[in-house]
């Protein structure tokens, strides 16, 4: 049996070598190149392909992969919105993803960023860099004094709620599919409008499905408290970034944190320097002292990388054996 992997990063290699040592009977080959119509031929002779990329898995790419006899595709990440499922269905692709690799990684990151926004650490860091040790006017706020609205109470959202409880914050939550334990605690509000009206800070943990596109838009922001803090480490398309910028300009939004961006594949968050980005909004946001940006690295811990590699390769082997792994994508 042979597995071919695309887009293997240097930081993934230790986890891959660990997996190979535990599975010596499996032949593994890989490249740092991403899966494209041109690179699909590299997988010829393999039973499964393991991938991770923000580039789309287009009809052309899937056709090229199927033409070299590979129709088992195992993603090392959770998102599947960049797959042409019509083409995948046409070629009978088996697809898996890694829906749960480390909820703690993303939840911790988002809560740390929210805490930093409340304590105005970016402004303080800028002052320190200028050798300015004066306190004012960078007064912070305590997490325990905030009502924090959590939108989405899946694996990550629930970890975030536990962290918030540790801080002593009042937590309210909204989810179309409530968790029974959280419901018993009385944390849920009935509508997003209720959450918007009550929350001092809002953090999102919902998928980037079409119904959630620009969930946070001008209408939603207008319903929020004045001076609301918004943190998004879920999916970039949840934010209408123009509405966010307008909210920051008006002061309706006091602080904003994001780890994901709607156009991140095309901008410098993925491909290089900010000055080379085709999207001027990134430079605008980065320059603001009340905005904190990370380049889609909320997940990026040693534990998460290990799980993403190990689970995806395990699924690739299962597909090659004609089995259905627990993390197979139903489509």
Curated annotation (Swiss-Prot):
Binding residues annotated for NAD(+), in chain numbering = 155-156, 175, 206-207, 212, 233-235, 259
Q: How does it assemble?
A: Homodimer.
Gene3D superfamilies with a match to the protein in the record:
NAD(P)-binding Rossmann-like Domain
Q: What protein is this chain from?
A: D-lactate dehydrogenase
- In short, the EC number is 1.1.1.28
| CDD domains noted in UniProt | LDH
This enzyme catalyses: (R)-lactate + NAD(+) = pyruvate + NADH + H(+)
Q: What class of enzyme is it?
A: oxidoreductase
The cross-references to Pfam families, in alphabetical order and at most eight, read: 2-Hacid_dh, 2-Hacid_dh_C
Q: Which family is this sequence assigned to?
A: Belongs to the D-isomer specific 2-hydroxyacid dehydrogenase family.
Per the record, the domain of life is Bacteria
Q: Which InterPro entries match?
A: D-isomer_2_OHA_DH_cat_dom, D-isomer_DH_CS, D-isomer_DH_CS1, D-isomer_DH_NAD-bd, NAD(P)-bd_dom_sf
Q: Catalytic center at which residues? A: 235, 264, 296 (proton donor)
- Please give one Gene Ontology molecular function term for this protein: D-lactate dehydrogenase activity
Q: Give the UniProt keywords, A-Z.
A: NAD, Oxidoreductase
**Species of provenance:** Leuconostoc mesenteroides subsp. cremoris
């Amino acid at each position: 049996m042979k597995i071919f992997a695309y887009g293997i990063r240097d930081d993934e290699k230790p986890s891959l070598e660990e997996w190979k040592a535990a599975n010596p009977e499996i032949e593994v080959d890989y490249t740092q190149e991403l899966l494209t119509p041109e690179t699909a031929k590299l997988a010829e002779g393999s039973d499964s392909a393991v991938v991770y990329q923000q580039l789309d898995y287009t009809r052309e790419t899937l056709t090229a992969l199927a033409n070299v006899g590979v129709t088992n595709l195992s993603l090392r990440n959770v998102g599947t919105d960049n797959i042409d499922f019509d083409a995948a269905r046409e070629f009978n692709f088996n697809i898996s993803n890694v829906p749960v690799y480390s909820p703690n990684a993303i939840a911790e990151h988002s809560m740390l960023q929210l805490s930093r926004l409340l304590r105005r650490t970016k402004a303080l860091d800028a002052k320190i860099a200028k050798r300015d040790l004066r306190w004012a006017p960078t007064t912070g706020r305590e997490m325990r004094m905030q009502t924090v609205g959590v939108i989405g109470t899946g694996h990550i959202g629930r970890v975030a709620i536990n962290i918030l409880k540790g801080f002593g914050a009042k937590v309210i939550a909204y989810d179309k599919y409530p968790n029974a334990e959280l419901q018993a605690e009385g944390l849920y509000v009935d509508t997003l409008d209720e959450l918007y009206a009550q929350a001092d800070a809002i953090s999102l943990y919902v998928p980037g499905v079409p119904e959630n596109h620009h969930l946070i838009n001008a209408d939603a922001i207008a319903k929020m408290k004045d001076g609301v803090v918004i943190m998004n480490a879920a999916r970039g398309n949840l934010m209408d970034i123009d509405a966010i910028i307008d909210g920051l300009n008006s002061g309706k939004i006091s602080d904003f944190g994001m780890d994901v961006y709607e156009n991140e594949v095309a901008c410098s968050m993925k491909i290089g320097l900010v000055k080379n980005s085709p999207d001027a909004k990134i430079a605008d946001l980065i320059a603001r002292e009340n905005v904190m940006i990370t380049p889609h690295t909320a997940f990026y811990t040693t534990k998460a990388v290990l799980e993403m590699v190990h689970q995806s390769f395990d699924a690739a082997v299962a597909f090659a054996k004609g089995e259905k792994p627990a993390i197979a994508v139903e489509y």
